[in-house]
From Swiss-Prot:
InterPro entries: NA-bd_OB-fold, RNA-binding_domain_S1_IF1, S1_domain, TIF_IF1. It is found in: Cytoplasm. This is Translation initiation factor IF-1. Belongs to the IF-1 family. HAMAP family: IF_1 (MF_00075). PROSITE patterns: S1_IF1_TYPE (PS50832). The keyword Iron does not apply. One of the essential components for the initiation of protein synthesis. Stabilizes the binding of IF-2 and IF-3 on the 30S subunit to which N-formylmethionyl-tRNA(fMet) subsequently binds. Helps modulate mRNA selection, yielding the 30S pre-initiation complex (PIC). Upon addition of the 50S ribosomal subunit IF-1, IF-2 and IF-3 are released leaving the mature 70S translation initiation complex. The keyword Protein biosynthesis applies. The gene is infA. Component of the 30S ribosomal translation pre-initiation complex which assembles on the 30S ribosome in the order IF-2 and IF-3, IF-1 and N-formylmethionyl-tRNA(fMet); mRNA recruitment can occur at any time during PIC assembly. Gene3D superfamilies: Nucleic acid-binding proteins. It holds the Pfam family eIF-1a. Keywords: Cytoplasm, Initiation factor, Protein biosynthesis, RNA-binding, rRNA-binding. It comes from Lactobacillus delbrueckii subsp. bulgaricus (strain ATCC 11842 / DSM 20081 / BCRC 10696 / JCM 1002 / NBRC 13953 / NCIMB 11778 / NCTC 12712 / WDCM 00102 / Lb 14).
Amino acid sequence: MAKDDVIEVEGKVVDTLPNAMFKVELENGATILAHVSGKIRMHYIRILPGDRVTVELSPYDLTKGRITYRFIK
């Protein structure tokens, strides 16, 4: 899958799950399961419930995603 094939959407972190997984509610109302990207993990950026984030979704599975950016409050 090429990097051009990803779908980027904004959402809000609803819940924190084990293994750096998060439940994210997207702008369209759907709730997905998302994990943290390597760059966010590498720079020790903390993601907490209530944070606004950008999520990359694969066109093949729209229920799982990768958190790529956390907006500053």
